[in-house]
Amino acid sequence: MSQTLMHSRFSSGFLHHQPEKGFLTLQTQRRHAKTLKGEKEFPSRVVSCHKNVDSSKNFSSSCEKSKTQEKILAQTLGATSDGEAIVQPNNDFEVTWQNTLRRKWDAFSIFSRPYSAICTIIGISSVSLLPLTSVADFSPAYFVGLLQALIPFLCANIYTSAINQLVDVDIDKINKPYLPLVSGEFSMGEGRAIVSALTFTCFAMAIMSHSVPLFVGVLVYFLIGTAYSVEHPLLRWKTKPAMAAFSMAGLMGLTIQPTVFYHIQNVLGKPMVFSRSVAFATMFFSIFAACLGAIKDIPDVEGDREFGNLTFSVRYGQEKVFSFCLNVLLLAYGSAVVVGASSSSLLCKTVSVIGHTVLASLLVLRAKSTNPKDPESTQSFYMFLFKLLYAEYVLIHFMR
């Protein structure tokens, strides 16, 4: 009997290859398997599973697989008559730097929360287009200015996610056991090194840009992201519902929209004018982000309650918070329809009214199929909201 080992983020421990014993059953929750062949050890990975294995038949695990599951070299799997799981290595198995690098990159992709990083990239790219008035504005100076904004804000965004994970390791053992610092893919030392590198890079790039709006934006973003997570009597804003909502609004709305807009105006030598479109974007994304922050905490009630984090969901209940956020988002879309309808341009009026009506309808339909008490359902709804954000970054160009 033999099976292929697969990676799982939910288990830990060591298994040993003992070829002198027979195969009967497998019951293990271990993660890092080590096989012995002579005096050498062969690191491998094994999925966490409670299954009986028939030694005469093949089986396939029905255990949950990580979305970032790695493709690794095949091993054979079985168990001894004592219930001890064992592994037989393939002769050609060996650890390579490519495998290690791939594993670390996969861990970093989870560590950086790609959906948030993508939102930052799309948002900055979109807002940077608002000051442009003609094709001639697509100059080398514009693209340099865009990169000057993208790199430090992206580093600051990943820093915010990383510092939160460094501080919340114990809570994440309950709420998010797949995160690299919890699963062991990253050590605490590696996490701190990444945070330090991101901090240096974001400020170095902001300073070298010689752009006051950009530096102020990056500094405020960094300070809010730090205050949101770090332990301090006056900080740790994520445990204070009102400050947590302000933090999300500040990060995604009040900071990026105006500072990137003014930065590009400065790069292009245009007068500092706060346009109708950037004013709408700042207000809309601030409201949307505050609701995102509250919805983000809905699946984490168990861990937050155990560690005394009095989020809105812990205080008022998941269903009430979900319903309130949904109504606020619908109000924001309704306001967007009104603002769009007041445009003097027929094209802008038509696109903004129809576009926001469609997005609001999609929001309602998705909300009806979401169960606030089901963490997976709520997390899926949370990710859906980011798709609505991506669409909004297109519509803001018609709010003129």
Swiss-Prot record:
Family of this protein: Belongs to the UbiA prenyltransferase family.
Catalytic activity as recorded in UniProt: umbelliferone + dimethylallyl diphosphate = demethylsuberosin + diphosphate
The UniProt record lists the keyword Cell cycle: no
Enzyme class at the top of the EC tree: transferase
pH dependence (record): Optimum pH is 8.2.
Function summary: Prenylates umbelliferone in the presence of dimethylallyl diphosphate (DMAPP) at the 6 position to yield demethylsuberosin (DMS) as the main product, together with a minor amount of osthenol corresponding to 8-prenylated umbelliferone. No activity with other coumarin derivatives such as psoralen, bergapten and xanthotoxin, or with geranyl diphosphate or farnesyl diphosphate as prenyl donors.
EC number: 2.5.1.139
Induction pattern: Up-regulated upon UV-B irradiation.
Gene3D superfamilies: UbiA prenyltransferase
Entries under PANTHER family matching the protein: HOMOGENTISATE GERANYLGERANYLTRANSFERASE, CHLOROPLASTIC (PTHR43009:SF7), HOMOGENTISATE SOLANESYLTRANSFERASE, CHLOROPLASTIC (PTHR43009)
Keywords: Chloroplast, Membrane, Plastid, Transferase, Transit peptide, Transmembrane, Transmembrane helix
Single annotated GO MF: prenyltransferase activity
UniProt transit peptide range: 1-48
GO biological processes: cellular response to UV-B
Localization in the cell: Plastid, Chloroplast membrane
Protein known as: Umbelliferone 6-dimethylallyltransferase, chloroplastic
Pfam families the UniProt entry points to: UbiA (PF01040)
Tissue: Expressed in roots, leaves and stems.
Activity modulation comment: Inhibited by psoralen, a major downstream product.
